[in-house]
Amino acid sequence: MRSYLDFEKPVAELEAKLEELRALGARDGAVAISDDVSRLESKAAAALAELYATLTPWQKTQVARHPQRPHFVDYCAGLIEEFTPLAGDRSFGEDEAVVGGFGRFRGRPVCVIGQEKGATTEARIRHNFGMARPEGYRKAVRLMELAGRFGLPVLTFVDTAGAYPGIEAEERGQAEAIARSTEACLALGTPNVALVIGEGGSGGAIALATANRVLMLEHAIYSVISPEGAASILWRDAGRAQDAATAMKITAQDLLRLGVIDGIVPEPTGGAHREPEAAIRAAGDALAEALTGLADLDADALREQRAQKFLEIGRRL
C-alpha cells in the first residue's frame, strides 16, 4: 500500500477516487468508465507533477525520509552484479548500518559502500536506522584500502541522519573513526563517486562522501545538522524545523548552485519511492557517467582533484 506524506493529501484523494473507479469497472464490466478513468488519471498526474515541481525544502526533507524510498540494498541489488559483502572492522565487530563489499557495476569491478536504514521494523533495528557506529566507519576504511590496493573505483551511497551519538560509540572513538574514514576517502588513488540517495546528515555523511564527484538525487538533502536540530539550537524550538530547512540550503538544487555537489540525478515524478526501478536506473547512469569522466586521471591527479574540490568549498563558503 502506498504511503502518502501530509502535503500529498490532494493527490492522495484523487488517486483514492481513481482506485474506486477501477474497482467499480472490475466488478461490473458493463459499466463504461474508461473515459472517466483516463480523465482522472490525467488530473492526478498533473496534480502530482505540479506539486513536486514546487516542493519547499521542508517538503523535500519529508520526501528524503519517505519510508518507501529505495535504500542502499535496493540500489546494490539493481546496479551491482556478483556482489560479495565483507563484514567487520578487524578491530571490534560488525556494524550493519554500513554495508559494503565488491562486485561488478556495468561490467567493471568496483568497491561499493553504503549506509542502510532498513525497510522494516526488524531491519531498521538491525541496521540502527543507518546511524553508523565507529566499527562501521572502520569497516569502510578497510574496504577503501582494499579497493586502493586492487585499483578498484569506489562507489558510496549516503543515506543517514548522522553518525550514532550513543555513549558506547563515543567511548569507542566515534569522532576519530569519522575522521579516519574521511582521510581514507581523500587518500584513495582510485576514482570515488558519492551519491546521496536520501538524507546526508553531518559528519556521518561526509565520512563516505569526500569524493571526486558528489551527486544527489533530486529530492535528497545534505546538511551539517537536521532541520529539527538546527531549529532547537537557533530558536530553542524544534517546531521551527520548516524555517531551518529553508535557511540551511539543504536541497540538491541549492547545493549545486553553491558548488558543494557536482550534479543532480532526476527522480521520477512523485519521488523515487513511486518508481524505484526508474530511480535506480537513473542513478546508475549518473554514476557510470561520473566514473567515465574520471577514467583518464592517475592516482596523484585524483587525490589532487579531490583535495582541491573540498578546499575550494571552504574558500567559497
UniProtKB/Swiss-Prot annotation:
Gene3D superfamilies the record matches: 2-enoyl-CoA Hydratase, Chain A, domain 1
PROSITE patterns: COA_CT_CTER
Keyword flag Nucleotide-binding: yes
Reactions performed catalytically: N(6)-carboxybiotinyl-L-lysyl-[protein] + acetyl-CoA = N(6)-biotinyl-L-lysyl-[protein] + malonyl-CoA
GO-annotated cellular components: acetyl-CoA carboxylase complex
A GO BP entry: malonyl-CoA biosynthetic process
UniProt keyword annotations, A-Z: ATP-binding, Cytoplasm, Fatty acid biosynthesis, Fatty acid metabolism, Lipid biosynthesis, Lipid metabolism, Nucleotide-binding, Transferase
Keyword Manganese tagged: no
Similarity comment: family membership: Belongs to the AccA family.
The name this protein goes by in its record: Acetyl-coenzyme A carboxylase carboxyl transferase subunit alpha
Gene designation per UniProt: accA
